[in-house]
Design a protein with these regions (language model features):
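A short, glycine- and basic residue-enriched loop/turn
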Residues: 21-24, 58, 67, 138-140
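Glycine-rich beta-to-alpha active-site loop
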Residues: 96-141
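Conserved phosphate-binding and hydrolysis motifs of nucleotide-dependent enzymes
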Residues: 19, 25, 63, 117, ...
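Glycine- (often His-adjacent) and acidic-residue-rich active-site loop
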Residues: 47, 55-100, 119
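Conserved CoA-thioester-binding segment of acyl-CoA-metabolizing enzymes
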Residues: 1-56, 72
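Hydrophobic/aromatic residues within transmembrane alpha-helices
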Residues: 16, 53, 65, 126-128
Length: 141
């Protein structure tokens, strides 16, 4: 599991947190992969009854990390650290950003998104994927 997303499981609750507080949890290629891996890791867990997705720090997710755009553009292969490659999901071609949202829809357990601070762009997309959203009144969406 990546340091970009942490998972703590206790009493049947998977506490899944985006973990780039210094960047307001903005996503880049590594973060997209880490989100997908986190969701995938919960699929076959019989000890998890619910997942709560949130962000460490003062924001859920401020969207794309613009500083990673140039690295994504210049990467020519999927193995580049910051690339967000097109991949297969249930037989369809999808972008890693779509997979980061879709993975929460695939879980057979309820997924709750706890939002505060910002949920912009890619962060908004990831906030809309879970089954339930709990939103702080000052959240910017």
């Amino acid at each position: 599991m990546s340091d970009y997303v942490t998972i703590n499981i206790e009493d049947g609750v998977a506490d899944v947190r985006l973990n780039r507080p210094e960047k307001l949890n903005a996503v880049d290629g590594k973060m997209f992969r880490a989100i997908v891996e986190a969701g995938e890791s919960l699929k076959d867990r019989s000890d998890v009854r619910v997942a709560v997705l949130s962000g460490n720090g003062r924001s859920f997710c401020a969207g794309l990390d613009f500083s990673s755009f140039q690295a994504m553009e210049s990467s020519s292969g999927e193995n580049s650290e910051n690339s967000a490659p097109i991949d297969l999901l249930e037989g369809r071609m999808t972008h890693m950003g779509q997979q980061a949202a879709w993975v929460w829809q695939e879980l057979e357990i309820p997924v709750i998104c706890a939002l505060e601070g910002h949920a912009l762009g890619a962060g908004f997309q990831n906030a809309m994927a879970p089954d339930i959203r709990i939103v702080h009144p000052d959240t910017n969406m």
